[in-house]
C-alpha cells in the first residue's frame, strides 16, 4: 500500500524518485510536518571535486531547504583520514591533512551553487567532523562509545561482508570508520539538533549504526533516509563517462562538457533524470520523458540546460547550447569549447598525429590514437584525418585547431 506523506519534503522525495528506504517513514513525516528538521549528508574529501554521482544527494539537500528545513553538509575532514570501506575492494590511499583541506575547499564551491548558507533557521550549515574527531581521547572513546557496538553485527553488514567473503583484507583502521560515522550523527544531534541523516543506499548500515548509537546515548528520536544507487538504463554507474569522472567543478570539467554529458542522455533515462536533477514539475518531466523519436532531443537539450544552469548559471548553459549548435549543426567552433593549451616547445618542429593527441592530453596513448584514426573517428577543423603518422606542425595548428574525437568530443588546441 502506497504511503501518502503529509510533509512537502517527503512527498517530493517519493514523487520524484529520491526515496529508497526510511527507518520510520510515518514518524519522520510527522516530524517534518510539525517544524524545521535539520538533516545532514556526509562527504569524505577524497577528491578535489564532487562528481555527477554526488548530484542526486545534493539535490535532496536542495529540496530539503526549499521545503522549509535545514540542510547540513558535513565535510569529512576527520573520517577521510580513515577511509570508508563500504563496497570497496581495497583500502583507500591515505591523504595528507593539507590535501584533505584542499579537497574540502573544492567541494565548498559546488555546495554554494545549490544551497543558501547563513545563520537563519533554514539556512544551510557546512561543518567539518574534524572539529570533534581530531580531539577524541582514544580510551574514553572506547569506553563511552565503543561499548555500544557489536562486532558480530558490524561484520554482518553487506558492505563489510562482501569484502570478507572475497577474502580481501579489511584493516582495523577501516573497520573503525563505521563507529566514527555513527559518532558524527550523535554529535550533530547533540550540538545542532540534527534529526535526519540521508545518503545513498550503500550507506544504510552506517546510518542505522548512528541512529542506534544516538538513541542509546542520548535517547534521541532520529531518522535515516536513503536514495537509490543510480545507474543509467544501460547499466552504467552515474558519475562516469567514457572520458572518466564527470566533475562538478568548472576547473576540472568545462561547463560545455558538463552540458554535453546531459545532452547525451539515452532516451529511456530522460524522464527519470528530469525528475531527479531539475526542478521542473513532475507532470512536465513525465510528458517530456514520453516523447519519441527526434522529438525527445528537445527534452534532452532542456535537461542539459536546466542541470547546467543550476551548477554553472544560465549564461554558461546558453553558451554551451550555442556551441553545440555551432559544432554539430553548422560545423563551426562556438564560444564554449574547452581550450587545450599546448606549449610550442612540445610541438617543436612537428609531431605525428598520434603523438600530438597524446601530448595535448586528448587520448591516453598512441595506440588509442591509431585506433581512432583507423576507425575514421578523428577530424581536424572538420576534415577527416586518415594517417596517424602524418606530421602536425605549428602551421597545422595555426591560431587554433579544432580537434573532433568521435561525434561528441570537441576541443580547441592552441599553442602557448
Swiss-Prot record:
Any coiled-coil regions, as ranges: none
Motif ('KMSKS' region): 237-241
Chain positions recorded as ATP binding sites: 240
Ranges spanned by the short sequence motif 'HIGH' region, renumbered to the chain: 45-54
Family designation: Belongs to the class-I aminoacyl-tRNA synthetase family. TyrS type 1 subfamily.
Function: Catalyzes the attachment of tyrosine to tRNA(Tyr) in a two-step reaction: tyrosine is first activated by ATP to form Tyr-AMP and then transferred to the acceptor end of tRNA(Tyr).
Identification of the protein by name: Tyrosine--tRNA ligase
Protein's organism: Cereibacter sphaeroides (strain KD131 / KCTC 12085)
Amino acid at each position: 500500500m502506497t504511503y501518502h506523506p503529509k510533509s512537502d519534503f517527503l512527498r517530493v522525495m517519493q514523487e520524484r524518485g529520491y526515496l529508497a528506504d526510511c527507518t520510520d517513514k510515518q514518524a519522520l513525516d510527522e516530524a517534518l510536518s510539525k517544524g524545521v528538521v535539520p538533516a545532514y549528508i556526509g562527504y569524505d574529501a577524497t577528491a578535489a571535486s564532487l562528481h555527477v554521482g554526488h548530484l542526486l544527494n545534493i539535490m535532496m539537500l536542495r529540496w530539503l531547504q526549499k521545503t522549509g528545513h535545514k540542510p547540513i553538509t558535513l565535510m569529512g575532514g576527520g573520517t577521510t583520514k580513515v577511509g570508508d570501506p563500504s563496497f570497496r575492494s581495497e583500502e583507500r590511499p591515505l591523504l595528507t591533512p593539507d590535501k584533505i583541506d584542499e579537497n574540502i575547499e573544492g567541494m565548498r564551491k559546488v555546495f554554494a551553487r545549490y544551497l543558501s548558507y547563513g545563520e537563519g533557521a533554514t539556512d544551510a550549515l557546512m561543518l567539518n567532523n574534524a572539529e570533534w574527531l581530531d580531539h577524541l581521547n582514544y580510551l574514553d572513546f572506547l569506553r563511552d562509545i565503543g561499548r555500544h557496538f557489536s562486532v558480530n553485527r558490524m561484520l554482518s553488514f553487506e558492505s563489510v561482508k562482501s569484502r570478507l567473503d572475497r577474502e580481501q583484507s579489511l584493516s582495523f583502521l577501516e573497520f573503525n570508520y563505521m563507529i566514527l560515522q555513527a559518532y558524527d550523527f550523535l554529535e550533530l544531534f547533540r550540538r545542532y539538533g540534527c534529526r535526519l541523516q540521508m545518503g545513498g543506499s550503500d550507506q544504510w548500515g552506517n546510518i542505522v549504526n548512528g541512529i542506534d548509537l544516538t538513541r542509546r546515548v542520548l535517547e534521541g528520536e532520529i531518522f535515516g533516509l536513503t536514495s537509490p544507487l543510480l545507474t543509467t538504463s544501460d547499466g552504467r554507474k552515474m558519475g562516469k563517462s567514457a572520458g572518466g569522472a564527470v566533475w562538478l567543478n568548472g576547473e576540472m570539467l568545462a561547463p560545455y562538457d558538463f552540458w554535453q554529458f546531459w545532452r547525451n542522455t539515452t532516451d529511456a533515462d530522460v524522464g527519470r533524470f528530469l525528475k531527479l536533477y531539475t526542478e521542473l514539475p513532475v507532470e512536465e518531466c513525465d510528458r517530456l520523458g514520453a516523447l519519441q523519436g527526434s522529438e525527445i532531443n528537445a527534452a534532452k537539450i532542456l535537461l542539459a540546460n536546466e542541470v547546467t544552469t543550476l551548477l554553472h548559471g544560465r549564461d554558461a548553459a546558453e553558451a554551451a547550447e550555442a556551441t553545440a549548435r555551432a559544432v554539430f549543426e553548422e560545423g563551426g567552433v562556438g564560444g564554449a569549447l574547452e581550450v587545450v593549451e599546448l606549449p610550442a616547445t612540445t610541438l617543436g618542429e612537428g609531431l605525428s598525429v598520434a603523438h600530438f593527441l597524446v601530448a595535448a592530453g586528448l587520448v591516453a596513448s598512441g595506440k588509442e590514437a591509431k585506433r581512432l584514426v583507423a576507425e575514421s573517428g578523428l577530424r581536424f577543423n572538420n576534415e577527416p584525418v586518415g594517417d596517424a603518422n602524418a606530421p602536425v606542425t605549428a602551421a597545422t595548428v595555426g591560431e587554433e585547431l579544432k580537434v573532433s574525437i568521435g561525434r561528441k568530443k570537441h576541443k580547441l588546441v592552441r599553442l602557448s
